Amino acid sequence: MARHLITSAIPYINGIKHLGNLVGSQLPADLYARYLRGRDNEVMFICATDEHGTPAELAAAKAGKPIAVYCAEMHEVQAEIARNFGLSFDHFGRSSSERNHVLTQHFAGKLDENGYIAEVEERQVYSIDDGRFLPDRYIEGTCPNCGYDKARGDQCENCTKQLDPTDLIEPRSAISGSTNLEVRATKHLYLRQRSLKDRIAAWIDSKTDWPILTTSIARKWLNDGDGLQDRGITRDLDWGIPVKKGDKPWPGMEGKVFYVWFDAPIEYIAATAEGADKRGEPDSAWRRWWRLDEGAEDVTYTQFMGKDNVPFHTLSFPATIIGSGEPWKLVDYIKSFNYLTYDGGQFSTSQGRGVFMDQALSILPADYWRWWLLSHAPESGDSEFTWDNFQQSVNKDLADVLGNFVSRITKFCRSKFGETIPQGGSYGPEEEALIQALTTRIRAYEGFMDHVEVRKSAAELRAIWVLGNEYLQSAAPWSTFKTDPDKAAMQVRLGLNLIRLYAVLSAPFIPFAADAMLAAMQTENRDWPDDVRAALEALPAGHAFTVPEVLFAKISDESRDEWQDRFKGIRG
């Protein structure tokens, strides 16, 4: 049994996430985790809420709540929405946990011990009207690289360029909007990434199987311009992980906290520990996933994220791991995604533009969204969500192909043989050809899933569904029944077994529909079809079943138009 560690980029706590966030990290990570579990691998699937930094402080202030209260409430909101979308995390943690405090302070202490921390006096933006230093994300302005007028002081979300606040044109306070700013001296800790550049570059060069999107971004930040720069890892904030050197005070750093992008990736490790704590397991239970000297040498670690997160996961977090000098597990494969756009523009949490996860679930079940998002995942380039395309894909793929097959075969069997799988007949050339075609397609599906090629996997799965419809149309058991009831019984028996097969193969994409199909077939048999012929005999003659409710209702033109109108503006 292979062991797979999977992490999804952890979402900011500042509100409910939109569909672009979902398809860029959590959803494809869940797809992969479900697939690997279905193939009998040992999987640890981790995510969390990212609760520190400017977004949390600003959102709590806007909500009029203490930040700790706000974060606790929003964690539960995000966790519930994740459950409703079928995201099968083994643990959904919190970056504000005690585990993350201890681990973050531990890593900082080790980095300092190994000479990779520098204390730097820098000049930072201070808002006179707000009476405080403004961390990067508290400052907005125009990006000097692309001209986007809502760029933040750490990164432009439009062109993804990493920025310093002083780079912005016409900067203003994100708290008050004041332009009454000045630059003052303050002291901070810097991670000496430049000293680790050669080791990081060699590590990236060794990853010859990574997606081009991932490696191109990593190499850009590693080599372009002045190359990899040292990065500040502390901030003048009240909320966050206090700066300590392991478990000891850090002189001169009193009142400061670690930068959110230093502690957030460490939460992957901390969340694994949180999960073990919750289950009452010893430390060895989580360390076997993360420590090469304690059992993690046989773990394959895959990360999922949007392309804007790639620099932090290919440079800064590996610098932390490598610089610690300890045998922590480095990522083996980073699956990164481009952007999902919305009706000609960008999805945006900060701007409230697009369809958000709670809104999506209020109008349609999760599987509708899961299927469209994964089958249109922005892998090789940006993808665009339009209501027309959403309607067409759902109606054609889910209703006309899969749903239609399940409905036709179960209803026909009930009408001619009752609600038990009929006996009689034996396979002929048509069935043998179907088994061969299914075997070829399923092996291709496995290959695409093994390599985390999401869109190709979806296309192959749909082709597998189509084979069932084509067989049913060609075999026409409703006609065969008139002259050869035994042969019709065999055709129906094969068709009903196909439903179980489809449920198993489809579960990573549409888990709720898969559960419904298995429930209708009155089986808990989720065995993977390594042998397709055997899989099509899993449910024997005499096995009872029920005709399920409609798996997928079609989206009407009226509903499409209503939703398009409802979500054309910004979220209030």
Curated annotation (Swiss-Prot):
Gene Ontology annotations for the cellular component aspect, listed alphabetically: aminoacyl-tRNA synthetase multienzyme complex; cytosol
Entry keyword Zinc: yes
A biological process from GO: methionyl-tRNA aminoacylation
CDD domains per the UniProt record, alphabetical: Anticodon_Ia_Met, MetRS_core
Enzyme Commission no: 6.1.1.10
Sequence positions that bind Zn(2+): C143, C146, C156, C159
Gene Ontology MF terms: ATP binding; metal ion binding; methionine-tRNA ligase activity
Keyword list, A-Z: Aminoacyl-tRNA synthetase, ATP-binding, Cytoplasm, Ligase, Metal-binding, Nucleotide-binding, Protein biosynthesis, Zinc
Reaction equations catalysed: tRNA(Met) + L-methionine + ATP = L-methionyl-tRNA(Met) + AMP + diphosphate
Cofactor binding note: Binds 1 zinc ion per subunit.
Residues annotated to bind ATP: T349
Official protein name in the record: Methionine--tRNA ligase
Organism: Paracoccus denitrificans (strain Pd 1222)
Lineage: Bacteria, Pseudomonadati, Pseudomonadota, Alphaproteobacteria, Rhodobacterales
